[in-house]
C-alpha cells in the first residue's frame, strides 16, 4: 500500500489524479496541498484523504515535510498560466519555483518516487518561453536524485478547464470531434485529462514496485502513446 502526496489537485489533470488515487485500492493515504479545497474532498473518506489548504504557498514545503507517514510517491500536476500570474516572469517564479521547492522537500523527507505532469514540448533549450520553462523544471527535478523519477509529457490536454483559454479550447473541441470519429485521430497529439491522470497513478505505482521498462530504472519518461497505454481503462 502506498502513501501519496499531491499538488495541483484542483486543476484539470490534478482533479482526475485525486479521483484515481481515491479509487485505487493500492493507495492507503492521500495528502493534498493546494490553494483551494479539491472538489473530490467532500465525498472522500477522511481516513484516506487529508487536505491542507493555504493561499500562502511558502507554507507548502513545510507541510509536505511534516507529513506522517512520509509519502512514498509525490505527484505534481501543479501549474499556472501567464494571465493568472500576471506575466511570464511571475508564472516562471510560481510554476518553476514551487515545483522545484516541493520536489526538494519531498526528496529530503525520504519520498522514493517523484511523478511530474510536464508537457510534450518540454525542452530547456527551446527558444519559446513556456516549453523552455517546462524543460527547466524537468532538469531541476531530475538533478535532485530521487530513487525513481517519472515524467509524463502529454500533448494537448482534452477536458474542461475552470479558467478560460480560448485558443486551447478551440483545439480541445477539434480533438473531441476527432476522437469521436476514431481515437487514433486524436491520441497522437491530444490525451484526455482522465487518461493522463490514470497513467500518472499507474506509472507511479509501477515505479514504486520497480516494474518499469528496461533502461528506465532511474528516469521514466512517458510520451503520448505511453500515456494512452498506461492510462487506459482496464
From Swiss-Prot:
Belongs to the FMP52 family. Keywords: Membrane, Mitochondrion, Mitochondrion outer membrane, Transit peptide. It is found in: Mitochondrion outer membrane. Pfam families: Epimerase. It comes from Aspergillus fumigatus (strain ATCC MYA-4609 / CBS 101355 / FGSC A1100 / Af293) (Neosartorya fumigata). It is a peripheral membrane protein. The lineage of its organism: Eukaryota, Fungi, Dikarya, Ascomycota, Pezizomycotina. GO terms for cellular component: cytoplasm; mitochondrial outer membrane. Gene3D superfamilies: NAD(P)-binding Rossmann-like Domain. This is Protein fmp52, mitochondrial. Signal peptide: none annotated.
